[in-house]
């Protein structure tokens, strides 16, 4: 299924990150918590400004981002994979290699 977010929305697939406890024990499943890193799968056209102009988004498809799951984050299942639909303002940083 192809999905295209509207306006300043971004579709992110959560990246699995290995978590370790303070004692060095590898945590898995619910003990590890959910990652706040993900890969951008799709982006909207941009934020509509008061002037009516559209400001393009700073993130692009393929970027790895660190995000905050704000109150507006929506979890969806698309093609048997869980994705998040968030606003660009919920993205805190782009991870550069």
UniProtKB/Swiss-Prot annotation:
One cellular-component annotation, GO: cytoplasm
Paired cysteines (S-S): none
InterPro entries for the chain: Chaperonin_GroES, Chaperonin_GroES_sf, Chaprnonin_Cpn10_CS, GroES-like_sf
Keyword line: Chaperone, Cytoplasm
Domain of life: Bacteria
Cellular compartments annotated: Cytoplasm
Example GO molecular function: protein-folding chaperone binding
Main location: cytoplasm
Keyword Chaperone in annotation: yes
BP terms from Gene Ontology: chaperone cofactor-dependent protein refolding
Subunit structure: Heptamer of 7 subunits arranged in a ring. Interacts with the chaperonin GroEL.
Family according to the record: Belongs to the GroES chaperonin family.
Functional summary from the UniProt entry: Together with the chaperonin GroEL, plays an essential role in assisting protein folding. The GroEL-GroES system forms a nano-cage that allows encapsulation of the non-native substrate proteins and provides a physical environment optimized to promote and accelerate protein folding. GroES binds to the apical surface of the GroEL ring, thereby capping the opening of the GroEL channel.
Stated name of the protein: Co-chaperonin GroES
Originating species: Erwinia tasmaniensis (strain DSM 17950 / CFBP 7177 / CIP 109463 / NCPPB 4357 / Et1/99)
Top-level taxonomy: Bacteria, Pseudomonadati, Pseudomonadota, Gammaproteobacteria, Enterobacterales
């Amino acid at each position: 299924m192809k999905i295209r977010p509207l306006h300043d929305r971004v579709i992110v697939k959560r990246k699995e990150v290995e978590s370790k406890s303070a004692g060095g024990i590898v945590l898995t499943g619910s003990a590890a918590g959910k990652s706040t890193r993900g890969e951008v799968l799709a982006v909207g056209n941009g934020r509509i400004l008061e002037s009516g102009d559209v400001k393009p988004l700073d993130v692009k498809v393929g970027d790895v981002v660190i995000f905050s799951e704000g109150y507006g984050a929506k979890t969806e299942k698309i093609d048997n994979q869980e994705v998040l639909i968030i606003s660009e303002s919920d993205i805190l940083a782009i991870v550069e290699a």
